[in-house]
Amino acid sequence: MKRQKRDRQSRAHTRGYQAGISGRSKEHCPYQIDAIKSQWLGGWREAIEDKQQGLFK
């Protein structure tokens, strides 16, 4: 059975989260489309909050 690709917005959120955990700035968002960019930034913000709470070093 073939695996379905996750939708673009879900991938953007995940990549934004990974960027936030690794300490990258939100200005490094690679997306131009507003809906996808907002998902990336949402993931980035979530990661920053998790880092501040001490979930990641």
Swiss-Prot record:
Provide a GO biological process annotation. Answer: regulation of translation
Major site of localization recorded for this protein:
cytoplasm
Annotated Pfam families: RMF
Q: Which domain of life is it from?
A: Bacteria
Question: Residue ranges under compositional bias (Basic residues)?
Answer: 1-14
Region of interest: Disordered: 1-24
Q: Where in the cell is it found?
A: Cytoplasm
What keywords appear on the UniProt entry?
Cytoplasm, Translation regulation
Classification via InterPro entries? Ribosome_modulation_factor, RMF_sf
Q: Which Gene3D superfamilies match?
A: ribosome modulation factor like domain (1.10.10.620)
Entry GO CC: cytoplasm
Q: Which family does it belong to?
A: Belongs to the ribosome modulation factor family.
UniProt function note: During stationary phase, converts 70S ribosomes to an inactive dimeric form (100S ribosomes).
Can you name this protein?
Ribosome modulation factor 1
> What gene name is listed for this protein?
rmf1
